[in-house]
C-alpha cells in the first residue's frame, strides 16, 4: 500500500461527508474545512513525516501551504486525479459508518460502546453515561483500553474530530467505528439522552 513506506502517511483533507463514504485504506482524515492546523500538529506529531495528500481539485496548494505553516514541509505531493481516480482504477477503498443523534438515541439502552474524544474541559461540562473518554490527541497512543472486536460510536463536540479519530482507529485495526454526526452538540440539542455531570 502507499503508506507502508516508513514514515509516510496518506492525509485526506476532503470534507468528512465525502471521506466517510470512500477513502484509501490507511489514510488519516484531517479536513481543510475544520480546525486543520492545530489537529495536524496534535495528530501527526512528527514534523518530518512524509505526507501524500488526497484532496479535491484545487485544494492541494492550500493544503501544502497550511501544512507548511505548522512546520510540516515534507509533502510528497498529491494523488493525481484524487480519490475518484483511485476508486475508478479498481483499487481497494474503505468506508466509515455514521449515525445521527436520533439513531444513537434508539440504540443507547442496548449497552453500546461510546467513545468521547473531546478535551477534558469539554467533558467536565457534560458527558454521556458509561462513555469511554480518550481525547483525540491521545487516541493514537492511548487506545489500549479499547477492544478491536467491539463497535464504538465515536463523538466529539461537533463531528469533525470524531471523524479524525475514526480514521486513526480504522488504521489501527478497529473496523467497527461509527461516527456520530453533529457530535455532542447534536446529541444534547436533538435527543433526550441523559447527560451526566461530574
Mark where each language-model region is.
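C-terminal accessory/connector segments of nucleic-acid motor ATPases
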Residues: 1-6, 15-19
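Rhodanese-like catalytic fold shared by cysteine-dependent sulfurtransferases
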Residues: 16-198
Amino acid at each position: 500500500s502507499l503508506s507502508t513506506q516508513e514514515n509516510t502517511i496518506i492525509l485526506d483533507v476532503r470534507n468528512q461527508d465525502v471521506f466517510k463514504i470512500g477513502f484509501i485504506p490507511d489514510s488519516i482524515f484531517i479536513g481543510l474545512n475544520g480546525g486543520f492546523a492545530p489537529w495536524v500538529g496534535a495528530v501527526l506529531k512528527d514534523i518530518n513525516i512524509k505526507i501524500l495528500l488526497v484532496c479535491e481539485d484545487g485544494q492541494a496548494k492550500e493544503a501544502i501551504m497550511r501544512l507548511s505553516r505548522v512546520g510540516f514541509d515534507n509533502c510528497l505531493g498529491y494523488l493525481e486525479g484524487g480519490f475518484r481516480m483511485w476508486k475508478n482504477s479498481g483499487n481497494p477503498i474503505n468506508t466509515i459508518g455514521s449515525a445521527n443523534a436520533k439513531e444513537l438515541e434508539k440504540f443507547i439502552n442496548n449497552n453500546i460502546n461510546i467513545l468521547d474524544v473531546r478535551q477534558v474541559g469539554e467533558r467536565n461540562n457534560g458527558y454521556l453515561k458509561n462513555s469511554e473518554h480518550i481525547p483525540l490527541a491521545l487516541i493514537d497512543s492511548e487506545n489500549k483500553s479499547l477492544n478491536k472486536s467491539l463497535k464504538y460510536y465515536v463523538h466529539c463536540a461537533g463531528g469533525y474530530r470524531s471523524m479524525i479519530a475514526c480514521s486513526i482507529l480504522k488504521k489501527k485495526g478497529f473496523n467497527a467505528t461509527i461516527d456520530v454526526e453533529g457530535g455532542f452538540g447534536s446529541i444534547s440539542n436533538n435527543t433526550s439522552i441523559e447527560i451526566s455531570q461530574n
